[in-house]
């Protein structure tokens, strides 16, 4: 057994904090059987054709680092601290990952790999071996309260595109439901059609909802994904207080990352619902009347919504409820669905790899013969649409909210 009781400083950097890893995680490092299932399903490994991006490689590297820093192993084996060059090479493999969780899904011994990668990124930040762009993420969020360093007062500007929007612009003092828009949908034109569609559906269905507007801050997922969990608390406190002031009993999210952050890292003060689940309930209650559409679609399960939150059925039920819409499943679907390349801050860290992963996803979708890829994530829509448009792929990408809005009678 490995003695992890003492973890010493790394070179000239700050001490490596052993509190970054739970006891469970340290034990799980010893449980790996080297089966390589993780490498077989990893979108980064398959797109880059680099075995060093696999979970297996990362785990072996982490074990060697921790063992080399522990007194017993250091004395017996003469283990040395990694050089700066070695640290730089290893660190790059850690950030060239979408945090899709597919490795965890197939692990035969049940290692919680996604949690381990988050802890590892936190460790890299604490020890000073993080990617340069990590500090940009931190600074953008500190200064602008959104990851893109945009003016937070413009967070609800997309409301201008809502058909017949009320004078209050969905900014009410009180409401039963808060719609938490998310940074991607608030600021990226390719994704802004999603909140527009959802707002029009909610309005047509008679839902009493409000936005937070400029009082909505980033949910904090980019911080968590970058290893910056230490900076998360102000965002959680602010967003909770903003929702409290609205008196809402329920919060809905079209962004799976926001949805999962609120479910796992926020105190449960209101009911947390993803937009696909909320739409399903509206359909079941007969509040969303559909007109027929002659359309063949395939469905892409977002990583955080599918593998992360286990929401698989709701979006499919909504799709199947629309007359004339035919759903053709991807070869790899539900918990086995392949990432689109948009997660884990990868687009910022390695845009070329992110694009190559998106290419593979688009190619897989084209093989189904579908005219449209439907998903339930604004970042997935943006990532796949960007690749499809740049490369003139003959397929459209649409969020579940956009599909429902397209079929809405009103």
Q: What annotation goes with each model-predicted range?
A:
Residues 35-38, 100-103, 303, 341-343:
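Cysteine-cluster motifs in flexible loop/terminal segments that predominantly coordinate metals
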Residues 299:
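Hydrophobic alpha-helical positions that pack around
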